[in-house]
Amino acid sequence: MPKIRKAVIPAAGLGTRLLPATKAIPKEMLPLVNKPTIQYIVEEAVASGIKEILVIVSSKKEAIIDHFDYDFILENALLQKHKDQEHQEIKDIANLAHIYFVRQKHQHGLGDAILHAKSFVGNEDFAVLLGDDVVFGEQPALAQCIQAYEQTDCQVIGVQEVPHDQVNKYGIVTPEANWQKQALVKILGMVEKPAVNEAKSNLAILSRYILKPSIFTALKQVPFGVGGELQLTDGLNYCLQQGEPFFAKHFGGTRFDVGTKNGFIKANLYTALKTDAITKDEVLAILKEFA
């Protein structure tokens, strides 16, 4: 079985949930402490064995491209000021992986963004990571999905349980019977943002996928769906209906939806504590002062 070498990161969204901060700044460049969120996603991919990454961008996203490029003026300035650690950190960003970019000119949904990766992917199975979900843990979430792919030789979707009253915010999988507490379960169906009383489970599709090139054919066959957009979930369902097996991998780790204000704040606090940018006592003191 060939290794998963390539990953696609869609980053063309408008980030409307974080306006006005995202009016001129890509939401993917908003920082968790001192590192933009998309860098955490790229680092997860690299730590999972990915060698080549395609980032799908849109207009006003040049900052993402600049971030993963060399900056010789900045590097020289840091050297002259003997800031060796900062200099190395900046160089390391540009050397993380072979990173390419393509522009999605019109915002027609996640499925449309994935279609822009067809020539990059070729005939290889590949990974997809969405930038809204940052996951921290001992083992990268994507690496867990890749292991499940290697175990099953099937397409894999990363999932976690969400509260039952929030299933209408996610793509939800229909698992086979007796799925509770199983780390890997066969998928019978998928639906994008179902009504709370219609969801077959509370296993939410959460931004990590291992897919086969057949998804490109599927996305050409399905109509625009929820929100008037081309939904990746609909394309996955099409593949499922054609007899392609899928598995849901219940990945471990602490997940934050950094595309929301609440999740972004929580992720920053978590990152600050984990990197010793702030102590627990300092956080409690701040809460005592302002709460």
Curated annotation (Swiss-Prot):
InterPro entries: GalU_uridylyltTrfase_bac/arc, NTP_transferase_dom, Nucleotide-diphossugar_trans. It is an enzyme of class 2 (transferase). One of its GO terms (molecular function) is UTP:glucose-1-phosphate uridylyltransferase activity. CDD domains: UGPase_prokaryotic. It catalyses: alpha-D-glucose 1-phosphate + UTP + H(+) = UDP-alpha-D-glucose + diphosphate. One of its GO terms (biological process) is biosynthetic process. The keyword Transmembrane helix does not apply. It comes from the Bacteria. Its EC number is 2.7.7.9. Keywords: Nucleotidyltransferase, Transferase. Pfam families: NTP_transferase. Belongs to the UDPGP type 2 family. May play a role in stationary phase survival. NCBIfam families: galU (TIGR01099). This is UTP--glucose-1-phosphate uridylyltransferase.
